[in-house]
């Protein structure tokens, strides 16, 4: 099985990255802060004003290491990568399937909604006794209604737009009770629904930051198996949007991101002071809080779970690659359907 390599995250403004032999070296104010062998690196993600030497860029391209440039708040700016490992026959099959995407869309939605529902079920099982009666009832109602949506989608022969509508309904139910899964006494983490571009409260800021990291991993997974990350099935084409990466992210984010965010908040590893509010209302993680989240994200990706289709254990960080591989096998005709990743 593919080995889970390290992602190097650089969050400190003014850091310089260079190549020394077969190593990536990070320096700040002339002092070496880190050294990692290139053969242990899968990708490099840098935030804000970081200098990356041309020599390191060339070495990363030669080793198949992608460099992702984000601005200081985590918005995507650019990617630096070597030749894309594309297979023209696979991509033709992908483009053809995108014209009639219903079967793949159905599988993606079944995976996403099942995993969202599993997150609610786990929260009710672990903490239901602490929920006020009205909150517990609301979560149970969402669980029941999501089960109905799963049955409806599973039996549906409708077009992709109708399937997307069911996915949107499930998302509304899920995020409608997500705030009740937050057990921190800190009122600043109160969650009243998703807000994006920009996030307007600490919980949304944390979710958006983690979703950015997962999107990067899913995009890299698509490219590593030869798929075009820009052409999706659940997400429609839009210039500049990695639609297929977003497709793969949907079924994974309830488990990889949402549960991690809840853990960081409920265990009080993050406090209200770990966030800053900008003019205009946007809320962002502080630099130190970002390091806390990145460390937890790396540890989360090392945790192993049994893959329901492959029937073997794999680190969570490899699941995007495994799902991209399953999709490629389906598009080639080796699998009758795309098998979603279900969390149990």
Swiss-Prot record:
Transmembrane segments: none annotated. Its EC number is 3.1.-.-. Signal peptide: none annotated. Its cofactor is Mg(2+); Mn(2+). The keyword Magnesium applies. Gene3D superfamilies: CRISPR-associated endonuclease Cas1, C-terminal domain (1.20.120.920), CRISPR-associated endonuclease Cas1, N-terminal domain (3.100.10.20). GO terms for biological process: defense response to virus; maintenance of CRISPR repeat elements. Keywords: Antiviral defense, DNA-binding, Endonuclease, Hydrolase, Magnesium, Manganese, Metal-binding, Nuclease. Belongs to the CRISPR-associated endonuclease Cas1 family. CRISPR (clustered regularly interspaced short palindromic repeat), is an adaptive immune system that provides protection against mobile genetic elements (viruses, transposable elements and conjugative plasmids). CRISPR clusters contain spacers, sequences complementary to antecedent mobile elements, and target invading nucleic acids. CRISPR clusters are transcribed and processed into CRISPR RNA (crRNA). Acts as a dsDNA endonuclease. Involved in the integration of spacer DNA into the CRISPR cassette. This is CRISPR-associated endonuclease Cas1 2.
